[in-house]
Every structure is written in structure tokens, then in C-alpha cells.
Amino acid sequence: MFDTEVLLPDFWSILDAVPVTLLMAVTVFICSTLLGGLFAYIEHQRIPLLRQLVMVYKIAFKGVPMVVVIFLAYYGLPSALHFFATLFNAEVNAHSLPNWVIIIVALSACVAAFQAEVWKGALNSFDSGQSDAALSLGYSGGQLFRRVMFPQIIVAAIPDLANAFMVIMKALSLAFAIEVVDIFAQAQLTAALNFYYLEAFLIAVVFYMVIAWVVTKFADMIEARLRVRT
């Protein structure tokens, strides 16, 4: 039966996991955005061999479930780190790798495949005629990208970037599989103490909804300001 008396204690307990979850989400978002942007650039420039490797990467990481990638990273990253440490005669305890680092690496690798499509679409939306016009006016390659291309590309990408952030927030709920505690995991742990699962999960839902609302509003605000400038 629903008990309102546990809502406030559960709220404060689950709130403790919000900053950690947001920090991991932001870190994954930054890493995946940079990696995805690099992949999109390689595809846009049609760089031989690298373009084919990027395509294989995207197919692999878009097709394999994230939880599988997480476990592959969990069991594979320490071994890989130990191999490279041995190769370079470095003293590193590979098995002391924190689980939160493994989650960030695994999710960044997965989300980068989707972020590459976001940036690829944004790059394809840019009118190449503007590049010709800017170059004819004496713009350098750097000036062309900084003053003409990037402001328009980022505006086109913002809605999908906001969606990507929320995908990361939801994907972090898989982190508990390797004992990393996020909002969802904290709700499970809190409910396990008092057996009020419905109340704990409803509080988690509220946190997710508030974060989604803030991210959406922030993205809309940035997009509106950039559209005025461009």
C-alpha cells in the first residue's frame, strides 16, 4: 500500500545520487560528443580507410546492447590496461580501475556511434555554397569553420544533442550491473531497506522528469540565442 510517510526520507536518500549521476552523464556526453564529432568529420571528408573503420565502428556499437558493452568493458578493460602497462614497463594495477571509469568508457563508446550521426546530419545540412562564398572573400579554413560553419552546425545539432544527453541519463541505470550507483540504483537500495519500492521508484521518476525538463529548456534557450546570432 502506498505510504506517504516514507516519501520525504526516500527523497533525501535518492537525492544523494543525483550529483554523481549528473557528473557521469556530463562526462559521457562530452567524451561521446567529441568522439562522435571526429567520426562525423572523417565521414564528411571521406578519408580513405578511416571512413570504413568508422562505419564498422558505428554498426558494431549501434547493434550491440549497451549492457553487453558494459560487461565487455568490465572484464576487458583491466586486461587491456595490464597488457599495455606490461608492454611499456609501467607499474599499473589494472585491477584497481574504478567501476565508474569503466561505465564512462563503455557508454561513451556506445553513445559516440549515435553522436556521429547527429554531427553527420548537422554537417550535411550546411549549404556548401556558403563555403565557396566565404573562401572567395578571403576567409581561411579556420575562419570559415569558426565564423560560418560551426554556428550553423551547432544550431542544427542542439535538439539531437539534448536527446543524446537524456539517452545517457537513462543508460546510466545499467551502471548498477557493475555496482555503480546512480539515481535508479539508489532508488533500489533505498527501497530494499524499507520495502517501499513504489514510493522510491516514483521519486526516481520525478528526478528524471525534472532533469529532462531542465535539459530541454536549456537546449531551447541556447538554440534560440544562437539562431538570433546566425
Language-model-derived ranges and their functions:
Residues 1-230:
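Transmembrane alpha-helices and adjacent helix-loop boundaries
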